[in-house]
From Swiss-Prot:
EC number(s) recorded for this UniProt protein: 2.3.1.168
Modified residues (N6-lipoyllysine): 44
The reaction(s) this protein catalyses: N(6)-[(R)-dihydrolipoyl]-L-lysyl-[protein] + 2-methylpropanoyl-CoA = N(6)-[(R)-S(8)-2-methylpropanoyldihydrolipoyl]-L-lysyl-[protein] + CoA
Family to which this protein belongs: Belongs to the 2-oxoacid dehydrogenase family.
GO molecular function: dihydrolipoyllysine-residue (2-methylpropanoyl)transferase activity; dihydrolipoyllysine-residue succinyltransferase activity
Active site residues according to the UniProt entry: 395, 399
PROSITE patterns in alphabetical order: BIOTINYL_LIPOYL, LIPOYL, PSBD
Pfam families, sorted: 2-oxoacid_dh (PF00198), Biotin_lipoyl (PF00364), E3_binding (PF02817)
InterPro entries tied to this protein: 2-oxoA_DH_lipoyl-BS, 2-oxoacid_DH_actylTfrase, 2-oxoacid_DH_E2_comp, Biotin_lipoyl, CAT-like_dom_sf, E3-bd_dom_sf, PSBD, Single_hybrid_motif
Organism: Bacillus subtilis (strain 168)
Domain Lipoyl-binding: 3-78
Protein name in the entry: Lipoamide acyltransferase component of branched-chain alpha-keto acid dehydrogenase complex
Amino acid sequence: MAIEQMTMPQLGESVTEGTISKWLVAPGDKVNKYDPIAEVMTDKVNAEVPSSFTGTITELVGEEGQTLQVGEMICKIETEGANPAEQKQEQPAASEAAENPVAKSAGAADQPNKKRYSPAVLRLAGEHGIDLDQVTGTGAGGRITRKDIQRLIETGGVQEQNPEELKTAAPAPKSASKPEPKEETSYPASAAGDKEIPVTGVRKAIASNMKRSKTEIPHAWTMMEVDVTNMVAYRNSIKDSFKKTEGFNLTFFAFFVKAVAQALKEFPQMNSMWAGDKIIQKKDINISIAVATEDSLFVPVIKNADEKTIKGIAKDITGLAKKVRDGKLTADDMQGGTFTVNNTGSFGSVQSMGIINYPQAAILQVESIVKRPVVMDNGMIAVRDMVNLCLSLDHRVLDGLVCGRFLGRVKQILESIDEKTSVY
């Protein structure tokens, strides 16, 4: 018998922490290796955490709603067949490393994750004048965790700095702490009966990314009206037989995504990203699509959308939306997007100005398809199915001319869809 420790896994390349949203096991439950034991929410994705061992759950260390750093223990599992002697021999080495976080090893300096610090680590280090370059982390990949800093403070390791270092470091915390009171006073206070909702996981990431996008990217907007009467008639005529044959819905959105992917191939400038002293024009056309839940927004990616048929895109939309609803979305599902298409029409919007999905250069809002009287080329008035396409663009990367031509091409593709168009 041996007691094994399960730690918070790294559910994505840049993920530093995770929040336990739900335990799927309880103390005393028997689990097999790879059985899901918890649902964890990060700023990138919701995912089930599988057990690394076969055995019996002895203790749930993390609580539901608690945020833990990658590498921190979440539970203990009693296993069979392990050698207790080996387990005991390993423990002193681990505890010795934990008790001496100040000691800087040559190996730790080479670890790629060492320079990635969480906000909690940066705050504690700033408050106590700790040089993070002199701290060896005990987290995954040598990452410095909040516990490393707290342990250093508790053991008095901070005072090992010489007086000159302390003099230099002393002003930093004061200047760093000056803006904090101003920032705190700008937030509204809760009154009796108000409900406070902690900002964690996906909502925290949305807030951070949207703020970064809005403050860093000079947004500009343009809109174009499209007549999709023939597309609507064609889709409605085949949707039932398509569902019966394929097993999933043929949505209007699939036609829009396909049209955008085709136009991006013809206007590669739209498939670009700002990178400081250069603009990166992406080779792959990976369409990010916004999928909302009751309290969150996810942006999974349809990879190589330009190479897929309308049917293939419809299948991806259905599959990714289901993954979001079931909480099965992976980090890979969210990575690699080069252009975002948002189906704002699904909740009745007719005009909107989207915030660009950083670091992409544009986002297209597909609004509601509505019947409107339209003056035709022959001067007659007819009722047509019309939709507004609203484009937000990064004016560092894109100008009105190329965006207008791009939207015009999307419009042309959509208005040319009829009964001769193949969805396969």
